[in-house]
Amino acid sequence: MTSQERIHAAIPIGTAKIWLQRLREAQSTAAHLAEAAALLVVMTLFRCLPLDWASGLGGFIGRIGGPHLGLSRRALRNLRRAMPENSEAENRRILRGMWDNLSRAIAEYPHLARIAASGSGRVEIVNGAALTGLATTPEPAIIFGSHLGNWEIGSSTVHRLMGASVLSVYRAANNPWVDRLMRRFHRTRRAVPKGAKGGRELVRQLRDGGSIALLVDQKQNDGIAVPFFG
């Protein structure tokens, strides 16, 4: 019997599985903490910069680095399927624009309250009285937003106008520490994560006469499976 076999024989299989599971959990926690720490550093940098500088820097980083990430291969593949008439150059232009927009949205995250603030000059509100009116009426309402530009600005603006009378739904980050950090920038927003529990909260909000807000393309994995992009 080799030394390795003797070690395996000395440790019960059940105990070994428990220790392996704990090791995986520790590795996952360490990775999550490292990811959250890196995000905190980046967000602190963007927060210290003027808004336009932060947005511009975020866009520059996205345009330069984003197209080289593995996700870009999937994006290009979907673009070719969705718009086969496009040239490869046009698809890559769209791809760079996508990364520019996403990176700007991330860089603007620490500035959301400032962007959505009354009198900031950054947001044009058309018929805002309709939203403020909903905040004082017992009739429930469902507010839909489009997932375009910096969609978080729309959410922040709706919550500023309606206050506690509106409840929104969001997709929680896979990393719980990152999720907690991102929610800190929305301290005044009432929101629930998508899913069964969040769905029950939304129904309760409507039954109580409140309003809910959500994006029109909120993804639910427990829906009906249909063919999409192959």
Language-model-derived ranges and their functions:
Residues 113-230:
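Soluble catalytic domains of membrane acyltransferases
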Residues 2-145, 179-184, 188:
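Membrane-anchoring hydrophobic helices of lipid-metabolizing enzymes
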